[in-house]
Amino acid sequence: MTEFKLNYHKTHFMTSAANIHQLPKDEGMEIAFAGRSNAGKSTALNALTNQKNLARTSKTPGRTQLINLFEVEPQYKLVDLPGYGYAAVPEQMKLQWQKSLGEYLQHRECLKGVVILMDIRHPLKDLDQQMIEWAVSSDLPVLLLLTKADKLSQSARSKQVKTVREAILPFQGDVQVEAFSAQNKIGIDKLAAKLDSWFSSLLTE
């Protein structure tokens, strides 16, 4: 069997939804990108797709309040979920987002994996752990990307990856941890390979 590989550079914007009920039909395959506001989700999507402005990066954390869908190829979609956990967002809105994220992870049939992005210097905050827990309890595989890895030396980076790998063992799910830096092109290939492995299951179903 030939190796399954999608060309992420062909990814294009599909649509935005204010909540899970406005999403397109639950079909094909989706992989979600989740993370705290300013964890670097948009930057990671832009690096993966080699498009500077595919996902709008914002200097204001909490700006991305919509669910944004991108199509790699027909039936293969990437989903940019609203950033969570930013203090300047009203409490009511934060709770609403968390409810929506939980609903999406637990009820979206075409969701096949979750990429959770965390700043390598501040990983595994409460809401990050909540996201991992939701994903694992929904039998979804998880890739934890420790972003902004260029901010640490190589030895500090390796140490932090090891620490996070040990810290997530109690979750007991299919959780992989990798360092990532859009700026220094660290981890982009690993991200693409993981997405391919998740997407390829559509062919075997």
From Swiss-Prot:
Residues that coordinate or bind Mg(2+): 42, 64
Positions annotated to bind GTP: 35-42, 62-66, 80-83, 147-150, 180-182
CDD domains xref list: YihA_EngB (cd01876)
GO BP field: division septum assembly
SUPFAM superfamilies: P-loop containing nucleoside triphosphate hydrolases
Function: Necessary for normal cell division and for the maintenance of normal septation.
NCBIfam families: GTPase_YsxC (TIGR03598)
Protein name as it appears in the record: Probable GTP-binding protein EngB
Organism this protein belongs to: Mannheimia succiniciproducens (strain KCTC 0769BP / MBEL55E)
